[in-house]
Design a protein with these regions (language model features):
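Generic N-terminal leader/processing signal
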Residues: 2, 10, 68-69, 73, ...
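Enriched for short, Lys/Arg-rich terminal
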Residues: 28, 73-77, 81-105
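Short linear functional motifs in flexible/disordered or boundary regions
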Residues: 25, 29-32, 36, 53, ...
Length: 105
């Protein structure tokens, strides 16, 4: 896939990813699953870069940003914002079981 858009991560998304990968690799003692998660995440980021509007539009009246999109990655939800300067902004990566994820669904 040839990338159309670049991407960047918010500090929150960086923290989400660090915590998720650490939890899977160390707490669950499954580094292969952590690596698989990263591979799936990178695939979905690449897909969003090529097709920025491919994720489902998040419909939430309490969300202050418009045009936030989401992609499902196994048991996780990746929230991102395609913007007008030809990049996507990865906002959040949440475990779907977390009640906080219900706010964004």
């Amino acid at each position: 896939m040839a990338s159309k858009f670049g991407y960047r991560l918010t500090k929150r998304a960086e923290s989400d990813l660090d915590g998720t990968v650490s939890y899977i690799a160390i707490d669950l003692a499954n580094p292969q699953a952590a690596s698989d998660f990263v591979d799936k995440l990178l695939y979905n980021i690449e897909e969003a870069r090529v097709f920025p509007e491919s994720g489902s539009l998040v419909d939430n009246e309490f969300l202050q940003l418009e045009n936030v999109r989401k992609k499902l990655i196994g048991n996780y939800i990746m929230y991102y914002l395609p913007n007008t300067v030809e990049n996507i902004i990865l906002i959040h990566v949440l475990y779907m079981v977390n009640k906080i994820s219900l706010i964004f669904i």
